[in-house]
Amino acid sequence: FERPNIAQMQGYTSGEQPQDGSSIKLNTNENPYPPSPAVAEALATFASEQLRIYPQPDARALRQAIAEHHGVSIDCVVVTHAGDEALRLAVTTFVPPGGVVASTEPTYSLYPVLTQIQGARMVSQDLAADWSLPADFAETVNRAGAQLTCVVNPHAPSGQFTAISRLEALTKALQGVLLIDEAYADFVTTEGA
């Protein structure tokens, strides 16, 4: 009963997940350290009876706090259960079946999976020799007719950081939507991040 593009898919295989307890798993963005004492203190005062009920379906209080922190309208804030859900939402929102998603190679391995689920086509361009975005990236993406272009910044696995000015130029040059995946942004100390 499933759609033909789903029936032809291979299962998604995540990266290595060492369970030895001594590895720091940066590929899953996990923190190897315990929470700060301030977090532990805040959790101790948390009303645990709230754990038995569902949160606000629209996450209004959280969205409002995020909007105020970033100086934007609450309508500009979408809260998801995790980053992968946000990526899925972007693909299903911006890319029609038969459409095109673009990225670089290498990139996050979930992009092609989400693209295939959507019944779309993935177009990738190799990074430049120094792991930066190729100079003709926007031209290649536009020629492919991409509705959504995904750029990981900082790039995984290289750690290459794309300057904000380069990303701003890319937004102006692209004919589709630019998604900047900042899953590892908290690890950047580069100025302009």
Where in this protein do the model-derived segments appear?
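Hydrophobic/aromatic ligand-binding patch that stacks against planar heteroaromatic rings
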Residues: 114-115, 170
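Phosphate-binding glycine-rich loop
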Residues: 60-100, 118
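Conserved PLP-anchoring active-site segment centered on the Schiff-base-forming lysine
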Residues: 93-114, 128
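Glycine/Thr-rich phosphate-binding loops of Rossmann-like dinucleotide-binding domains
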Residues: 34-36, 87-88, 111-112, 158-159, ...
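Short glycine-rich anion-binding loops that position phosphate/pyrophosphate groups of nucleotides
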Residues: 29-32, 83-84, 108, 153-157, ...
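Active-site phosphate-binding strand-loop segment of PLP-dependent enzymes
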Residues: 123, 129-190
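N-terminal "arm"/small-domain region of PLP-dependent enzymes with the aminotransferase-like
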Residues: 1-53, 145-148
